[in-house]
């Protein structure tokens, strides 16, 4: 469901000492002793933690979430992991402006394009600077609103949406951006994603009709209780997820939709692990 402070999975402060408890999912770094090259930095406000493989052509997972060292999420030996910590999710993961869906939650901004540009133009060059060869493929994976961002980025890579170009205020100038190469992220995971987000279905239709070059795999999932809500916006989340998976598959993108047990808050790390296992197989 939503990634607002009222609905995000609660971070475990015992294992995530730098996280703001109650604000982000606990989908973070993996213990990966086979990949000894680990670095940390902050790039344009994003907290970056890398564990890079020395294997030539190793795939790279860009995992959206808080940076931590003790998460049980694992990636296979020979796969690189880049954790990307992002604050202000409703601003930085939202592709275009939209009203709040909870009375106490904030409105949604239009910062996703800026976040995507930062990933492509700053984070990726820094993270992959020590690789001997380009990665075989890159994956972008996120939970909740970060999952929405992963899906949006996967179909937006070659351009910018008209919603973003307009800005949040009437008459606002177009937001500056750098068009992403069509093949930046070949695989995406949207885990318990905010598939209810207004305008998402139409936007994906628009992008797919123009041909999405480069995206080859998409993993979508939800909990089987996530649609059981009186909220008129969120109650369609499962229907939308199934439609999105079908649209992606029909566009020639290898796609799957997995229904897990529980609501939005249950087994966050287990669901993220399922996504990674599917994407790297």
Could you say what each language-model-derived stretch is?
Residues 3-5, 32-281:
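Non-catalytic cap/lid and distal C-terminal segments of serine-dependent acyl enzymes
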Residues 7-32:
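Long, intrinsically disordered low-complexity tandem-repeat segments
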């Amino acid at each position: 469901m939503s990634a607002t402070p009222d609905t995000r999975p609660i971070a475990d402060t015992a294992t995530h000492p730098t996280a703001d408890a109650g604000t982000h999912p606990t989908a973070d770094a993996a213990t990966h002793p086979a990949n000894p090259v680990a670095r940390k930095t902050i790039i344009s406000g994003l907290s970056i933690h890398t564990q890079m493989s020395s294997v030539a052509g190793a795939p790279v997972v860009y995992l959206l979430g808080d940076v931590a060292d003790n998460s049980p999420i694992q990636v296979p030996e020979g796969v690189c992991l880049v954790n990307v910590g992002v604050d202000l999710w409703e601003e930085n993961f939202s592709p275009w402006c939209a009203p709040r869906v909870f009375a106490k939650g904030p409105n949604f901004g239009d910062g996703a394009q800026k976040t995507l540009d930062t990933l492509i133009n700053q984070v990726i060059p820094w993270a992959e600077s020590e690789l001997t060869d380009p990665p075989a493929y890159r994956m972008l994976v996120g939970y909740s609103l970060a999952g929405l961002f992963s899906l949006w980025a996967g179909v937006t890579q070659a351009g910018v949406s008209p919603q973003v170009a307009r800005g949040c205020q009437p008459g606002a100038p177009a937001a500056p951006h750098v068009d992403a190469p069509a093949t930046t992220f070949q695989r995406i995971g949207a885990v318990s994603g905010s598939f209810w987000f207004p305008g998402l279905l139409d936007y994906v239709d628009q992008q797919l009709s123009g041909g999405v070059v480069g995206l080859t795999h998409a993993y979508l999932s939800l909990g089987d209780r996530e649609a059981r809500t009186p909220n008129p916006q969120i109650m369609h989340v499962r229907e939308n997820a199934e439609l999105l998976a079908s649209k992606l598959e029909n566009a020639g993108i290898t796609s799957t939709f997995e229904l897990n047990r529980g609501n939005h808050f249950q087994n966050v790390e287990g669901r993220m692990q399922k996504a990674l296992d599917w994407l790297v197989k």
